[in-house]
Every structure is written in structure tokens, then in C-alpha cells.
């Protein structure tokens, strides 16, 4: 609702002075309420009376107030119907004709000395007395809806109520209602925020290796000179890094993702899980998800009324698989500060529970890179154990000798998850 910009300099006796009234987009209901309290006359407002009114520099005396009130209402499509009390309603030409019978001067004796002070934020707050102006601002480089909150905060720096910011016309214009001084300041401020956002291409390789896997990763991570990576890890050979059970990391120069894929293909003990690629704006999140939407039982109907063969169950569905979320921010110096959050969920083969069991591995961190550098994150270990029994039918049941025809085996599989992430600033042509 638009605010009322009013200046009612009426603190002295209404018997001797006129009321200087200035209204700018004032709610008509506030105006009627002020009139009722000023004259002491009860007024009923019809439910369909809505909208705003504007009046500039109207000096109204005590004898002119009823006529002024009725004229303002009629100019805005409303009328004051006679009665006890009178009713403010929409003007209907089929029912009413213009008449001054509703606006005869009110005797001075009906006023109680001084004019009562107007009530409500629109009348009482001095900071809303400024005149507001509405202008449009074309947005050339970003979406108007993204820029609107920034402009709104800028306008609220001054204590002037009634300022508004609306995105318009297919998100390429901003409609701004503010004071003249604010528009002048906004004209200088606007070009500093209406600038193109930098795009960031995030490429990733998510893979698993076994704890004993010793495939050579050096040609994928090292550069031709064999220089060490950030953090002091030697790129000549990363076997010890990739087979460690703790957290692993490294920052590499150059695009090593393609070479790392070749290294993974030559290893029989590595598994490529996903290769997400995300193009997003600086400061905006980018998300990649690949997996299944699995139902989990959350409740069952029990008791005599339950159908044993087909019981009623309530379920909830959750995504199980690989997910990657990044929020890159490009600094003025060209660095990339990136929030990284990844999850690798899988369904367990365990039968010890009555419902599905999921294995979860996740990483959430913030890294700082130069454009084109690659970071290695890892160390998420998953231990999988399985037991199997095999036997010869019938013969394995024979006492004493049946054990000779039965075999048992157990397998332990320890796999470690690694993530290679490369971020690169993409400039528009």
C-alpha cells in the first residue's frame, strides 16, 4: 500500500486558521478517518471503497472542510450519502446526481476547539512528507528481479517511507518510486550494480579406488617439469595419496581431467562414478544430481483390521546417488572462491534391518583457486563386507561327511572416494 505524504500544520486553533493539506497517493480510508475525527461526525466506509487520492496545497477553512471533503471524494469516484451516520461509497450515476446537500457547512460549535491531531503512520511520521516520483530504469546486464533487492536496500538508507521497487516488462526494467534526491543518487549508483556477471564452468570427475590400488596417476596430475602442486604434494607420483585412508587433497595447474580419465580406464580397480559439468554465474549455486528416487517406509497399519497380505504403508521418497553442488564467486582480483558440497549415497546389501539401508559419504568445504586450476578432494572410505555359503544339494545334509561338500567365504572391500574439480572463468565473446 502506498504511503501518504501529508503535511497538516494544524496544531493551533481551528477557529482562526485554515488547514494546509498536501496528500500524495494517500489511502482514501485514512483520509475519511481523518475527516471524521476532525469534524466529530461519524462516517461509515463501504467495503468497496479502496484506492489512493492526491491533493496539493489546499488551504481549507472550517467552513470549507465539508465541501472540500465531498469534492475530493467525487473527484476520485466516491460520494458521501446522507444519513445518520453518513456513508462513503462508490459513486453510482444511476442512483445519485451531484448535489451539495451532503456538504453544507458544519457549524463552528460542532468542533471541539483545536483540530484533533491526525492518526496513523501516513499522517504522523514526518519522514514521509517528501514528494515521491516514479521512474523506470532499464536493466541491461542482469535480471531485474535480481537487482531489485539491491536497489531497495539502497533506497532504505534514507528514512523516507513509501519507496518501492518493482521489476517490470519481462525482467528488463525496474519501476522505482522514490524522492527526487533519491533518484539523483540512484542514477549515479545504478551503473555500478548493473554490470555483467562472470560465468564459471565447473568440471568434475568423481571416482572410487580400492585401498590397495596402486595405479600410476602421476602423468595425469603432474606437469611436464614435474613441479610440485600447492600444499607440497609431489606430482611425480600420487599413488600414496590416492591409497591413503585419510583426507587427501591437492591443487594442480592445467587441465588434468582428460588425462585422469585415461588413468582410470587403465586401472581395473577403479570405478568412474560421475562426470558432472556445471556452468553457473558468479555467486549463483549450480547443482548436479544422478541416481534413484528410493521409497522408504515411514509407517504401517497394525492390528486386527490390517490386511496381512497387503498391509497399508506410508512411504517417503529420497534421492540416492551422486550429487554435487557448487557456489563459485569470482573476486575482483581474479581468484575463485568456491563452496563445494558433494554426496555419494548407495543402497546397502545388508539384510539386518527391516527396511532399506543407505551408505552415505559426503564432503562440504570451501576452496580458493585460480581460473583453470584443479583441486583433488578425497579420503571418504566405504567398507563393504559380504559372506557367502555354497553347498552341494542333499549331499551336504549327510551327517559327518556333509561338511566336506560345503564351503564358506567372506569378502572385504574397502573403497575410497575421490573428487577432481576444475573451475574456469568463462568470458563472453
Curated annotation (Swiss-Prot):
Record bears the keyword NADP: no
Signal peptide region: 1-18
Disulfide bonds: none
Entry's Gene Ontology cellular component terms: host cell membrane; membrane
Gene Ontology process terms (BP): protein secretion; viral extrusion
TM ranges: 320-340
InterPro entries referenced in this protein's UniProt entry, alphabetically: Bact_Secretion_Sys_Channel (IPR050810), GspD-like_N0 (IPR049371), GspD/PilQ (IPR001775), NolW-like (IPR005644), NolW-like_sf (IPR038591), T2SS/T3SS_dom (IPR004846), T2SS_GspD_CS (IPR004845)
Keywords annotated in UniProt: Host membrane, Membrane, Signal, Transmembrane, Transmembrane helix, Viral extrusion, Viral release from host cell
Intracellular or extracellular location(s): Host membrane
Major place of residence: host cell
Entry keyword Transmembrane helix: yes
Membrane topology summary: Single-pass type I membrane protein
Biological function: Acts in the assembly and extrusion of the bacteriophage by forming a channel across the host outer membrane. This channel is just large enough to allow a newly synthesized phage particle to pass through. Extrusion is a process of concomitant assembly and secretion and takes place at specific assembly sites where host inner and outer membranes are in close contacts.
Subunit structure: Homomultimer. The channel is composed of 14 G4P subunits that confer a barrel-like structure. Interacts with G1P; this interaction results in a complex that spans the inner an outer host membranes.
Stated family: Belongs to the inovirus G4P protein family.
Protein's name according to its UniProt entry: Virion export protein
Source species of the chain: Escherichia phage If1 (Bacteriophage If1)
